[in-house]
């Protein structure tokens, strides 16, 4: 719009989730008019991240080194292994400060419609890991979508001979949720997964 380089900046900003044309233009203008030093720092941080952040060899999350800090932490409980779809899921669980076990990132979920099969995920590595390093409990923390449920079922079948206890995250009523506003599927899951007080 203004210059070829400006248009290129806007185009690249648009690859971020939730950023459309107008938002990208506002960001570009803001960086160029008011925040040039911060824009340069952002460019440097982005360059370093793209170059230096790698996949952890053990859990397949992100790391600055071959093995991430969570996998290196001796205070983590080796008896618990939480299987998630993405590194974002690891971050979400860590923010709860309620889980002290290990993680394993699948790299997505099964989705035949999108052409994503078990071979496209880290499922084979997961099976190998639980064979080599037995765990007491494998927690399947995949999404509640059809794809997430299918992935959890597939993993359960693949590891059940090697793990004594395979569990799934509880599903149902969110904290502070009003029953009248819940969809019938969520409410049905909550009724099926009710717990003792």
Swiss-Prot record:
Domain Toprim, residue spans: 79-174
First and last residues of each zinc finger (C4-type): 56-71
Cited CDD domains: TOPRIM_recR
Keywords (A to Z) from UniProt: DNA damage, DNA recombination, DNA repair, Metal-binding, Zinc, Zinc-finger
MF terms (GO), sorted A to Z: DNA binding; zinc ion binding
PROSITE patterns associated with the record: RECR, TOPRIM
Pfam families registered for this protein in UniProt: RecR_C, RecR_HhH, RecR_ZnF, Toprim_4
Record has NADP as a keyword: no
BP term (GO), one: DNA recombination
PANTHER family linked: RECOMBINATION PROTEIN RECR
Functional description taken from the UniProt entry: May play a role in DNA repair. It seems to be involved in an RecBC-independent recombinational process of DNA repair. It may act with RecF and RecO.
Family: Belongs to the RecR family.
UniProt-recorded name of the protein: Recombination protein RecR
Protein species of origin: Psychrobacter arcticus (strain DSM 17307 / VKM B-2377 / 273-4)
